[in-house]
């Protein structure tokens, strides 16, 4: 893949630099991928190419394995397990694997006294995991959040800048290499960011990786109209991953948020990522940088390599598996936010009062209303900004609007984030 071949070239070009900085000699002894003869950006030594990655362990002496396949299960999991059991250090950018099997793999690494490093799994070139594990090690972190997916951040930024639809900007992102050309679903639906927030939670709060159901929404339903209305309100739409401890319970979520244009997070645009931690005694810490692509990812992979070569064997999640606690999940239905609701309705008398009455019935208090008629098509757009309300209230309320003939489309919901 793109990351693997870029890493291969970086290892060659920076071999002497790495050896000087660590005092250790390094050699690439084996490579494995699906297709030996595939055209690649850089030439590879086919003499050390293996079609079956597991065969490498029987024929070569390996100290460190880079796993850049990217699957949560299958050969990715199998080869990492095999390496750790055979006392081989592992470095991976695979967030899906770590988010799903990180605890199991961490136990294997600790049992066999080897390293499992995954700095590149979250926010590409930003050293956020090492910052949490080492730089903020004595702090009690209560909250971690940020922009964790460069694809979606580019799309939302470019929709605003170019005044183009989601569909057009997605195609542009695919041409530029910011979005997968085949199936970008895992970026767009929030899953990629969600895997990253799970890893950040485990590291920040010294807990086992959560398996509980959480709010996970992507940007597929964001329209150019929402971008324009947000702009009028002095707001921007960002896909945020958020994790915090509320009443000694873990709350994790990924969803689009309306943030102030004057806020720090509201000015992180394009393919950039940003991660913010809040804790004691340090207060707020911010890291920003490119979150994806072979360059930033390889940078983090090489930083993990240097850490291993310098002889440090550390628990993968900062503290040993046995000392990491399980924590109860916060009830998502009690999560509260102000809301942006956009309705497309028939332009007729009584529809607005119908909507506000329904909202009031479910304890959703209206803060602001914007109504834009479309006389030509006999319809109107109604945007409502609410005061804070719970997920339970909004879920129960919105289900009723599905059945009303005056509501032409199911309302678009975006949460406000302060």
Residue ranges and their predicted role:
Residues 110-192:
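Rossmann-like NAD(P)H-binding beta-loop-alpha module
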Residues 169-267, 272-274:
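Substrate-binding/catalytic subdomain of NAD(P)-dependent oxidoreductase enzymes
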């Amino acid at each position: 893949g793109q990351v693997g071949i870029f890493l291969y070239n970086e290892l060659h070009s920076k071999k002497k630099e790495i050896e000087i900085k660590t005092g250790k000699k390094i050699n690439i002894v084996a490579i494995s991928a699906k297709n030996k003869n595939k055209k690649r950006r850089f030439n590879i030594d086919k003499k050390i190419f293996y079609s079956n990655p597991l065969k490498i362990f029987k024929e070569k002496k390996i100290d460190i394995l880079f796993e850049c396949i990217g699957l949560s299960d299958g050969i990715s999991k199998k080869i990492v397990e095999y390496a750790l059991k055979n006392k081989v250090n592992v470095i991976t950018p695979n967030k899906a694997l770590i988010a799903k099997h990180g605890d199991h793999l961490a136990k294997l690494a600790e049992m066999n006294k080897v390293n499992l490093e995954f700095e590149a799994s979250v926010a590409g070139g930003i050293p956020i995991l090492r910052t949490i594990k080492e730089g903020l090690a004595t702090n009690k972190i209560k909250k971690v959040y940020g922009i964790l997916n460069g694809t979606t951040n580019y799309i939302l930024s470019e929709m605003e800048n170019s005044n183009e639809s989601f569909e057009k900007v997605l195609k542009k992102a695919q041409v530029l290499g910011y979005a997968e050309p085949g199936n970008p679903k895992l970026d767009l639906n929030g899953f990629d960011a969600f895997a990253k927030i799970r890893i950040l939670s485990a590291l920040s709060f010294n807990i086992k990786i959560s398996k509980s159901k959480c709010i996970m929404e992507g940007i597929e339903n964001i329209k150019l109209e929402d971008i324009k209305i947000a702009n009028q309100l002095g707001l921007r739409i960002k896909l945020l991953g958020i994790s915090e401890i509320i009443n000694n319970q873990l709350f994790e979520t990924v969803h689009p948020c309306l943030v102030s244009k004057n806020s720090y997070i509201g000015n992180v645009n394009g393919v950039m990522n940003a991660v913010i931690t809040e804790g004691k005694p340090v207060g707020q810490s911010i890291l920003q940088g490119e979150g994806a692509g072979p360059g930033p990812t390889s940078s983090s992979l090489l930083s993990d390599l240097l850490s291993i070569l310098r002889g440090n064997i550390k628990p993968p999640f900062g503290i040993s598996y046995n000392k990491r606690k399980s924590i109860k999940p916060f009830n998502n239905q009690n999560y509260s936010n102000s809301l942006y609701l956009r309705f497309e309705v028939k332009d007729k008398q009584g529809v607005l009062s119908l909507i506000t009455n329904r909202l009031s019935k479910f304890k959703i208090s209206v803060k602001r209303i914007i109504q834009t008629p479309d006389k030509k098509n006999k319809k109107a757009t109604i945007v409502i900004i609410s005061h804070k309300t719970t997920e339970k209230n909004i879920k129960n309320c919105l289900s009723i609007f599905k059945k009303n003939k005056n509501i032409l489309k199911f309302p678009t919901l975006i949460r406000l984030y302060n």
